[in-house]
From Swiss-Prot:
The keyword Ligase does not apply. It comes from the Eukaryota. GO terms for cellular component: cytosol; nuclear speck; nucleus. Its main location: cytoplasm. This is Protein Hikeshi. It comes from Gallus gallus (Chicken).
Length: 197
């Protein structure tokens, strides 16, 4: 029913079923994992009105299981990518795996999937930073570079009355830089690869 994928590793397509409606994947050497993909295999859909909440579990310093809600998968949204690299020091959250005695090993984390009503899934709040940004890193870099350039150039802005004439320096009006900045942002939003044309 479910699969789990970590970059550079084989796909796991056989979770351990720990209850009728709960499944667990082991993630060995979890300290070196940044992202996890959880997906439905397409062989068995969720029953009508049901979906699966996805949890990340890791052992804390004392070896106790810490569970954190990452998000969910449904028949309409059969896969999701979760960032887990920043979650290994966070606090746990309420979870449906509490009564189960799942073995914990210091270097093995787990992804848990709990089949639940869709109306319950949408009311749950995933841990912050688990969702992967939908903006690619190039677009994010370009946006930050634009902001940095505009802020840097604007920090030198002076009024015409404050200017001291210097024949060896060229001055660019701040409104020209602002217009360029706004145009570049607009074009980047419309097509992040516009600069290649």
């Amino acid at each position: 029913m479910f699969g789990c994928l970590v970059a550079g590793r084989l796909v796991q397509a056989a979770p351990q079923q720990v209850a009728e409606d709960k499944f667990v994947f082991d993630l060995p050497d979890y300290e070196n994992i940044n992202h996890v993909v959880v997906f439905m295999l397409g062989t068995v859909p969720f029953p009508e009105g049901m979906g699966g909440s996805v949890y990340f579990c890791y052992p804390d310093q004392s070896g106790m299981a810490v569970w954190q809600l990452l998000g969910f998968v449904t028949n309409e949204k059969p896969s999701a990518i979760f960032k887990i690299s920043g979650l290994k020091s966070g606090k746990g959250s309420q979870h449906p795996f509490g009564a189960m005695n799942l073995p914990q090993t210091p270097t093995v984390a787990q992804i848990g999937i709990s089949v639940e009503l869709l109306e319950n899934l949408v009311q749950q709040t995933p841990v912050a930073n688990a969702a992967v940004s939908s903006v690619d890193s190039f677009t994010e870099f370009t946006q930050k570079m634009l902001d940095n350039f505009y802020n840097f150039a604007s920090s030198f802005a002076v009024t015409q009355a404050q200017m001291t004439p210097n024949p060896s320096e060229a001055f660019i009006p701040a409104n020209v830089v602002l217009k360029w900045y706004e145009n570049f942002q607009r074009r980047l939003t419309q097509n992040p690869l516009f600069w290649k044309t």
